[in-house]
Amino acid sequence: MTTLGTPLSPSATRVLLLGSGELGKEVAIELQRFGVEVIAADRYANAPAMQVAHRSHVLDMLDPAALRVLIASERPHVIVPEIEAIHTETLVALEREQGQKVIPAARAARLTMDREGIRRLAAETLGLPTSPYRFVDTAADYREAIAAVGLPCVVKPVMSSSGKGQSTLRSEADIDAAWEYAQTGGRAGAGRCIVEGFIDFDYEITLLTVRHAGGTSYCDPIGHWQQDGDYRESWQPQPMSAAALRRSQEIAKAITDDLGGWGLFGVELFVKGDEVWFSEVSPRPHDTGLVTLVSQELSEFALHARAILGLPVGAEDGGVIGQSGPSASCALLAHGNGVPVFDNVADALRDPNTALRLFGKPRVDGHRRVGVTLARADSIDAAREKARVAAAALGIQLTA
């Protein structure tokens, strides 16, 4: 797609975002830089990407009839899934029946919507190294799986995001509570889970991998720290051995080649020395990749937009996207109930090498990521500290 129209005109190039959170918002902004007409959809009103889109729709994207009505009415040239909670079989059918373009492809969206499809592809079809695992449907199966993989282990709903429903079990005392949480924390309600054996890794990385018209290119590895299964900090580049980096790129290429299509993938990997294990892959920008808003000339969102549109991404096949030096991000979390209001914004931005993104989340109920601080410095440690200091300076209030 190298010819682009004018938005809100008969020539418009229309892109439909299925999912309108903070990552979708940045994708929408990058698409609009190329004059793309952006339509944003999600299950709730005033989602972040809706605030910058040309039009928006609220619907249950797990409802196949509602999804078909939306797509028929908007007639998008491209559909870009931005979350997992979508009736992906509808996308597969529309791709087959009508040639509807889905990013990166309808099969990739279907396989990656839950952990079972992608884990079986990686481990059983492609033979990639992974942690030991079992899929379970009942409490009895769950206990058998724990006995098989051993403690410590991790349990996750097959369909969840941002750490919801995920627990690390370190002793038998954790077993019952972890199962209960997994049954209430998944996007599709109670049901199937994965029990994963624990890998004694040195660190985790996200290897952002771009499939584009010119081939496959990679961003420098992103290190990250999680708490309660959710991203708290990320930094780029993560130091690692040449052998581990090479193996990481090989694994990322294998899984993304099989999924196919154009777009950016977030490939999550465990690393210990020169050894690398596949963990998960998302066929879209990744939350840990928010650091690329300051660490790269082309952020993960700009890369995704360019790849979607068939445009050059600034690197050749097998090449690495340009990086600006040690950079870090720190997530901003709000706790409680209400509409977020931010104080001391000037203090958070006092250092000239810091930046701030407030996502525009319409409401917080419980706890929610509402923004991110970003920083560059002479070292990763210094960049992380700057991002933390900026985050600590910001006040977050919740109003009724």
Curated annotation (Swiss-Prot):
Entry's Gene Ontology BP terms: 'de novo' IMP biosynthetic process
Keyword Thylakoid belongs to the record: no
Signal peptide: none
InterPro entries in alphabetical order: ATP-grasp, ATP-grasp_carboxylate-amine, ATP_grasp_subdomain_1, PreATP-grasp_dom_sf, PurT, PurT/PurK_preATP-grasp, PurT_C, Rudment_hybrid_motif
UniProt GO cellular component terms: cytosol
Enzyme Commission number(s) of this protein: 6.3.1.21
Highest taxon listed in the record's lineage: Bacteria
NCBIfam families associated with the record: PRK09288.1, purT
Protein name: Formate-dependent phosphoribosylglycinamide formyltransferase
